[in-house]
Amino acid sequence: MTRMRVHELAKELNMDNKDLIDRILKLGIQVKNHMSTLTDSAVLKIRQQFSEAKTETVEEKRIGRAVIRRRKKLTEGESAAAPAEGEERVASEALPVEAEMPAQPVEAPELIAEPISKLPPEVGVAQPQLPEEPEPAPEPLIPAVKPEEAAASELAVEPQTVVPPVAAPAAEVKPARPPMEAPAPARKPPEEKETKVKHAEPESLAEPLPSPAPVELTLVPAESAAGQVAERTDEEEEEDDKARPKKAKKRRRKKVRKDEPARIIKLPEIIPEEPEEEAVLPAHLATRIQVKTEEVEVKEAPRKKRPRPEEFEKEAAERKAKGTRRKEVFEREDLYSKQEIAAQDDRGRLKGDKRRPFAKEPARPEIAVVKPGKRKIRVDEAITVANLAKQMGIKATELIKKLLLLGLPANINQAVDFDTAALLASEFEFEVEKTGFEEEELLQVREDRVEDLIRRPPVITVMGHVDHGKTSLLDAIRDTNVIGGEAGGITQHIGAYYVMLPNGNVVFLDTPGHEAFTSMRARGAKVTDIVILVVAADDGVMQQTIEAINHAKAAEVPIIVAINKVDKPNANIDRVKRELAEHGLIPEEWGGNVTMVGISAKKRTGIEELLEMVLLQAELLELKANPAKPARGRVIEAKLDKGRGPVATILIQEGTLRTGDVYLCGVNSGRVRNMFSDRGQRLDEAGPSMPVEVLGLSGVPNAGDDFITLPDERQAKMIAEHRLVKLREKELSRTSKVTLESLFEQIQEGEIKELNLILKADVHGSLEAITDSLLKLSTPEVKVSLIHFGTGAVIETDVMLASASNAIVIGFNVRSETKVQELADQENVDVRYYDVIYQLLSDVKDAMVGMLEPVFKENVIGRAEVRQTFQVPKIGMIAGSFVLEGRVERNAKCRVLRDHVVTYDGKISSLRRFKDDAKEVKAGFECGIGVENFNDIKVGDILEVYELQEMKPVLESPPGDK
């Protein structure tokens, strides 16, 4: 006989492994764990001990005339104590429920008592897993009892099936928890009986309900039933809580097919097997037992011992399917089916599998699907790939892949502009809404009332070709000598002047005529009311004259032509008018609408007539402005002054600017600290059409920026910071955008030489003009690169940057301190200063030429014919030659021609005439010539002697130039 293990014996006895091990150790049998084996004698001893422990005695006690209490006592007092207390409590609670019924059939329970006392205890051990109980299941709170005792009570129920259902629920109440006993009597077993009993006849079903006869019979079995119920295990009682009418019916059908003898307590199965027992009992009693059987039914593998409160039963019944476990209280129906949950263990894992079945479920993409109403993203001027991916709710790697497919390599932190973001969003079916800082709402322009408008001086811009007399004309009008202060005699700044005339005040803007100052001229045309186009009578229409005409037409500004230098002998006014007519400026005397006046700025003739025409044109325009509103203007010029800091020349267009006003200018904001007129006079306020120099700027603004005054300094600072962020994002997206094509071009450009420059200028306008001109100098061979530029003097950081990047520092109209020059000498940095722009551009061109590879030109200086060869020891082959033409020089380049084919190209190593070394031999003489590292000279070869002349390289024209 094979040995039995502890866990097998525990299963047979329906005990927990630990409890059984404790009992075994008390018997003196040594075991280690539940896998330990037991000898046959040990098993027999254990079984005998349990059999003796289960010996029962039944006590009967008459409580009243119609009530008899039977108490089943175990030999072990402690195991029988709990059921006894339960019985007493059950009996006392059952009395009020059954008190109305007569006590006639008291004898019937006596028939039940005999089978209970006669049952051997071994029978309960033989069937440890009986799923059915005769006791009713309405109460969830049942005390735990040993499996053997439960089995014994199940077999004893057969005669007790006559017990009415009213007392049985009370008998099942767990004595350890009296507060939960109250709901038991409230239930109505007779109603359940009528719906669930199958084996009882219809008349027997109807009899027990109206008849009070079963009252006493019900109480007697209730006592015995209480004793039996106390022996049931907690697991069985907890399963009783789960019992439902539907489930009870289905499970009973299954159990009938199995014919398990331990389940004879179910009257529907017991009736055909033991008819003699049922014949003794009245039909109405049998019917009531079926009701209790239905309530006690549905027993499965034992689960948690803690019962569910009654108030949760209804909710649990709706949520659970049959046979499901209590673990379903963890609601995961959103992600998993109930079958998946039922297949999981207590830790949420598949049974027999350590992997979590739902580990990958929470990452389902459909859970994070963006709603249709939210498929719109907001993008400013630029946005990083990471922020765009976050708004779209997709991975940034997906956007990077899409950018690669579009030919735009990018990383997660790279900024893309609005158009690229819109293209990306459309690929993922998103809409893009361009949003920005709503400056328009904060900077709303108030409409002027007619009564608030007053006349303002006209703004006149003087334009024309370089050296045609623009500044000389202004000097004549202002009675000053501005041109004397300009380097090189040409205007390199845009100047603003307020001139008071007898017939009215006028504001003049003097723009440069040099080709480098195109942006200045365009800026002047945008802020002006009238343009005076100066044309030299001796030169006629030139390149910048045509450009000025186009700027004025683009700004839709009326033009008055001043034909200067009419006092010169070679002046030709008619030719000038004819050339202007070719460009759309028809003189009034020719039927056009353009006023043309001949003047001489040096002799100051025609000036008054010109001013009259200007004021007449201004009256026709009816120029008005409101001085009572916040000031708005335009930056004409800006610079960084060493003593005063950033200084900007502002032309007030409307409103009045006062000292202390809060301003916003581009990305700068602050308060106006001081104001000065064009003549250097301090001003407290400036009205419309008045140019002023403003101090107190937080930085050097760009020429052409709007100058606006605001009531709140915090608001101005917020707008300025927002503009700065937008500017940085825009520059970042422009500089960091690298396409596959541009990447290939950069690889090819590795051989292109690059001239690095650091540019510092006095004013922003000059800086802008020089920057544009320098960038236009780039050629396919040499590229001009401005690694840094700004306004102000050359400082130490500029020198250090130039040293690190191998750059040249250029200062325009600025100088540096002595220590800066010493640092430049120490670092071997070339620092150059200029006052005239064309000198600067010329030197930069020369520097670019110096970076080109030298060009050599080949000049043939002589030819000699080999007529005889000589072998000289330690020297080699010597060619006795006759100089046919030119001359032969020692160390000159030489080619050996044989049959007009170059055999060797080398150098003449020795040259002799007779026995003397010669420096050169001219034509018509014979000489001996030795060719370096070449001895295969033959008679008839021609020696061609040449020299390489180094030529100055020439820069190719920049792309686009003609």
From Swiss-Prot:
Keywords: Cytoplasm, GTP-binding, Initiation factor, Nucleotide-binding, Protein biosynthesis
Annotated tr-type G domain residues: 455-624
Basic and acidic residues bias: start-end ranges: 188-202, 308-327, 344-362
Region listing for Disordered, in residue ranges: 122-263, 293-327, 341-362
Compositional bias of kind Low complexity: 156-173
Chain positions covered by the region annotation G4: 564-567
Basic residues: bias regions: 244-256
Superkingdom of the source species: Bacteria
Region G5, residue ranges: 600-602
HAMAP family: IF_2_B
Name of the protein in its database record: Translation initiation factor IF-2
Lineage: Bacteria, Pseudomonadati, Thermodesulfobacteriota, Syntrophobacteria, Syntrophobacterales
Gene name in the database record: infB
